[in-house]
């Protein structure tokens, strides 16, 4: 005896135009929500970044009690909040309680073991050296790579790291490099952390690259920073 045929579900043909309109609506709504979320969170992100940099600046520039931000664009330095401020490298000048320039802080970044490492470091024009670093962002291996932020022996590298310019003033006299742990012999070398050579090399690379690029221009404009605190 033959089995009765199973009932067939009717196929509903959705017009292509209606489907495209629906997809366009969903895509448009998604894009709007992304933009809205960005606009709502951007001020908070920028404020958190400002606070992090300010805290880091007062750590890496001993004696600094106030700061002013500038934009360095080739041969010119202008206050960052000025209408004439050009695009370029943002620098942070720290001043002591006598309104004297105590040091200059710069941001630097390089690829680490896990992700990009971002730091703030201070340059002291008096000794032409790097006086300290503070990690702003990293995702290095806990207990290994993250030692760059807290290992006392590693941080000693930056008590007076040589950043003098060469005779022409166009670059560093000696490139800042990372060397094997325990083999440091020169003031421009960074004694790496044993077991965290990639993170150590990333710090050396970012300090060297940023200093090579910025310091030749910055040192020619120091007078503008010395006089800014009294304005």
Go through the PLM ranges and name each one.
Residues 2-231:
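Flexible, solvent-exposed loop/hinge segments and secondary-structure transition points
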């Amino acid at each position: 005896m033959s089995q009765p045929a199973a009932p067939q579900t009717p196929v509903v043909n959705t017009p292509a135009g209606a489907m495209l309109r629906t997809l366009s609506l969903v895509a448009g709504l998604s894009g709007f929500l992304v933009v809205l979320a960005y606009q709502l969170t951007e001020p908070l992100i920028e404020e958190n970044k400002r606070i992090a940099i300010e805290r880091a600046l007062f750590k890496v520039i001993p004696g600094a009690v106030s700061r002013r931000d500038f934009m360095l664009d080739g041969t010119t330095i202008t206050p960052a909040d000025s209408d004439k401020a050009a695009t370029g490298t943002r620098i942070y000048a720290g001043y002591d309680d006598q309104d004297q320039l105590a040091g200059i802080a710069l941001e630097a970044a390089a690829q680490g073991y896990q992700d990009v490492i971002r730091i703030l470091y201070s340059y002291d024009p008096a000794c032409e050296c790097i006086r300290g670093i503070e990690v702003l962002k990293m995702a290095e291996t806990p207990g290994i790579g993250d030692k760059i932020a807290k290992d006392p022996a590693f941080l000693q590298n930056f008590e007076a790291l040589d950043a003098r310019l060469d005779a022409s003033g166009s670059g560093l006299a000696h490139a800042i490099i990372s060397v094997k742990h325990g083999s440091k012999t020169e003031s421009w070398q960074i004694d790496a952390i044993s077991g965290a050579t990639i993170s150590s090399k990333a710090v050396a690379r970012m300090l060297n690259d940023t200093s090579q690029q910025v310091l030749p221009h910055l040192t020619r404009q120091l007078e503008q920073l010395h006089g800014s605190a009294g304005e």
